[in-house]
Regions:
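Structured, non-membrane catalytic/scaffold regions adjacent to prosthetic-group chemistry
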Residues: 20-236
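N-terminal secretory signal peptides and thylakoid transit peptides that target proteins
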Residues: 1-16
Length: 236
């Protein structure tokens, strides 16, 4: 899966004379920025994705679970979620701490950039609740979610951390959560345990698995796939 994405991206960039390592330069970068602006203009923070019926759940084993590392990542000993950046109160939250916060759940259709979709139920805490707890500064218009997963975006490069940056409006959408459960059961390692980002308003590659850091920041950064030319906003 990872190889095919990189291969297709490289082939797409060759006719444009663009460097796959510098997706924000040249014609491709201009097109992507215009697309992001259009998607942000169309985004409605209060609009919810429709709840799918219970019978629509995709059977276990038929919901693809992607990774960029050689194996599914295991949480390091003493794992905690670190929340920092432009915040009044930096946080270090254990899974037990997160479970004590007001829970939310929804059953929605997941959309992948490859064209497939699937339905799952997700349980967790809204990222807007985390923003409230840490006192996120209004100047932090972007949020970066970081994973302890490491992958190889380029064959000749060192492993890099999986991450994705988001616009603050999408982060605080009521269907954007840090999920610790799926389909009524605790999140499995393959699904992103102990904690993964999930949202009904973004494409799948924006939903970082194995999250260990949330950073509120004033500037937009990139992401593991975004740095390879994938859309930054990636709205559904």
């Amino acid at each position: 899966m990872t190889v095919s994405r990189r291969t297709l991206l490289g082939l797409a960039l060759l006719p444009l004379g663009c460097d796959p390592g510098k997706p924000h330069e040249g014609f491709l970068g201009l097109t992507e920025r215009l697309n992001d602006r259009m998607q942000r203009a169309l985004f409605r923070p209060g609009k919810l994705a429709p709840e799918e019926p219970a019978g629509a759940l995709t059977p276990k084993g038929e919901f693809p679970l992607y990774k960029v590392a050689d194996d599914y990542s295991a949480a390091p000993a003493g794992w905690k979620l670190r929340v920092h950046g432009l915040v009044a109160r930096p946080l270090d939250l254990s899974l037990a701490d997160l479970r004590r916060l007001t829970p939310t759940q929804f059953r929605v259709r997941h959309h992948c950039v490859e064209g497939w979709s699937a339905v799952a139920s997700w349980q967790g805490v809204r990222v807007s609740e985390i923003a409230r707890l840490c006192g996120a500064d209004p100047r932090a218009r972007f949020v970066e979610f970081r994973s302890f997963e490491r992958g190889y975006p380029n064959a000749d490069a060192s492993p890099v951390r999986y991450y994705s940056s988001w616009d603050r409006e999408s982060v605080e959408h009521p269907q954007t959560i840090l999920a610790y459960g799926r389909n009524g059961a605790p999140m499995s390692r393959e699904e992103g345990a102990p904690l993964r980002l999930y949202s009904a308003v973004k494409l799948g590659y924006k939903m970082v698995k194995w999250v260990d850091e949330v950073v509120f920041q004033p500037v937009r950064t990139g992401g593991y796939w975004e740095n390879l030319g994938y859309e930054w906003f990636a709205g559904v």
